[in-house]
């Protein structure tokens, strides 16, 4: 084969060759900027539909129930998107996180410790701030949990649109932080707001995860084992009362990431390569389409300015996340238990900390579980405003910093 012919071909992680000059729609969807644009477009469409004459049709479709009742899976379309489809996104996130922990940016112990410490700070500080501001107000005893969450899909979407110039370490830090943060939020929901937690279902899920790990260890590759196993694990986690997306994270982290000598790519790399376009181009946008459709009530927006709980949510997400994530990261590095990711400056970490304030869907869920009636509506409005404000501030910080970097400003 001539050199020019070799340049026209490439080999993907599945070992297949394709033309480098032909348009590859899957590769197009793997582009982070494209995925971010599709995600935000879907979220914008959802907000328009939920606040337009089409609101009733939108709500009818979102709330349409489908699924087998005998498995307790008679869920609405919106719930299938939130609990089912999003589990695949979390599986891809788990694959990426496992790869970074074993052979990537997080292989160093101190570098891996930093996002965990940052996530803990990003949960504790917003919760303390929200509790202090809302103390004594109706619902404040439970509403402190609302700003502890970070919406991983939307935070990564904003980063992909405005911070594509940043090194890989930035995405890895935010991904790791958000995964730990979401796991923390799931624990909060399970402990405080779940009445029917099933230990038997949790044990079944743990046993299925053990089978998955053993199959990986034995180098079994057939999808006829893994697909039913993954579905069964998801059903078990869902039946336990815990947010079912944790099944995706668990299986992703249990997938083998080192390739054997006879393999062109590891199972984790192959799965990530195959699922990434579906995750970015379909799964996350569909999730956003049904999750972001929150009616924006003018009266609720006005009323929230006089509601201490709503104010506590905004301050917790916008200020608490920034202070908690950045402050705990700074302390961890200074006392030597964490290491700043390669290629990132403190101002970069401050922008990533600001992205942690994009609570959105997880915070909306906690608001729904912890409050009722008008108080819940005001808290939801506060989550929307806080998430939008955090996104905007982070975008401005990233774009300004990116412009300086591209212009070769040494002090950037």
Swiss-Prot record:
It catalyses: Na(+)(in) + 2 H(+)(out) = Na(+)(out) + 2 H(+)(in). The chain crosses the membrane at residues 34-54, 75-95, 114-134, 142-162, 183-203, 234-254, 282-302, 309-329, 349-369, 379-399. Disulfide bonds: none annotated. It holds the Pfam family Na_H_antiport_1. The lineage of its organism: Bacteria, Bacillati, Actinomycetota, Actinomycetes, Pseudonocardiales. InterPro entries: Na/H_antiporter_dom_sf (IPR023171), NhaA (IPR004670). The keyword Transmembrane applies. NCBIfam families: NhaA. Its main location: membrane. It is a multi-pass membrane protein. GO terms for molecular function: sodium:proton antiporter activity. Keywords: Antiport, Cell membrane, Ion transport, Membrane, Sodium, Sodium transport, Transmembrane, Transmembrane helix, Transport. GO terms for biological process: regulation of pH. This is Na(+)/H(+) antiporter NhaA 1. One of its GO terms (cellular component) is plasma membrane. The gene is nhaA1.
């Amino acid at each position: 084969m001539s050199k020019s012919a070799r340049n026209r071909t490439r080999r993907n992680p599945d070992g297949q060759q394709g033309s480098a000059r032909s348009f590859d729609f899957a590769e197009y969807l793997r582009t982070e900027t494209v995925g971010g644009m599709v995600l935000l477009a879907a979220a914008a469409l959802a907000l328009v539909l939920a606040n337009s004459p089409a609101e009733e049709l939108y709500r009818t479709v979102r709330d349409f129930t489908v699924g087998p009742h005998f498995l307790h899976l008679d869920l609405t379309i919106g719930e299938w998107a939130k609990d089912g489809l999003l589990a695949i996104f979390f599986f891809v996130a788990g694959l990426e996180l496992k790869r970074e922990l074993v052979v990537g940016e997080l292989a160093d112990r101190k570098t891996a410790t930093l996002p965990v410490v940052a996530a803990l700070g990003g949960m504790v500080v917003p919760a303390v701030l929200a509790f202090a501001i809302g103390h004594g107000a109706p619902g404040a005893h439970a509403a402190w949990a609302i700003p502890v969450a970070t919406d991983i899909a939307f935070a990564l979407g904003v980063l992909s649109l405005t911070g594509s110039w940043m090194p890989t370490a930035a995405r890895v830090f935010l991904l790791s932080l958000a995964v730990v943060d979401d796991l923390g939020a799931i624990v909060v929901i399970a402990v405080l707001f779940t009445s029917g937690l099933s230990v038997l279902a949790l044990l079944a899920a743990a046993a299925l995860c053990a089978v998955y790990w053993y199959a990986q260890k034995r180098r079994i590759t057939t999808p006829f084992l893994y697909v039913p196993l993954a579905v069964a694990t998801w059903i078990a986690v869902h039946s336990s009362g815990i947010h079912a997306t944790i099944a995706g994270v668990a299986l992703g982290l249990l997938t083998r990431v080192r390739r054997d000598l006879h393999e062109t790519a590891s199972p984790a790399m192959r799965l990530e390569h195959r699922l990434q376009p579906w995750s970015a181009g379909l799964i996350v946008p569909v999730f956003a389409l049904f999750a972001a459709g929150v009616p924006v009530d003018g009266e609720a927006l006005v009323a929230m300015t006089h509601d201490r709980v709503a104010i506590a949510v905004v301050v917790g997400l916008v200020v608490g996340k920034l202070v908690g994530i950045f402050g705990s990261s700074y302390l961890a590095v200074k006392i030597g238990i964490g290491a700043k990711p390669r290629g990132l400056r403190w101002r970069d970490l401050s922008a990533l900390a600001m992205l942690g304030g994009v609570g959105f869907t997880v915070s909306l869920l906690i608001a729904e579980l912890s409050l009722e009636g008008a108080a819940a509506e005001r808290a939801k409005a506060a989550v929307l405003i806080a998430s939008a404000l955090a996104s905007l501030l982070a975008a401005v910080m990233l774009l300004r910093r990116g412009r300086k970097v591209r212009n070769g400003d040494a002090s950037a």
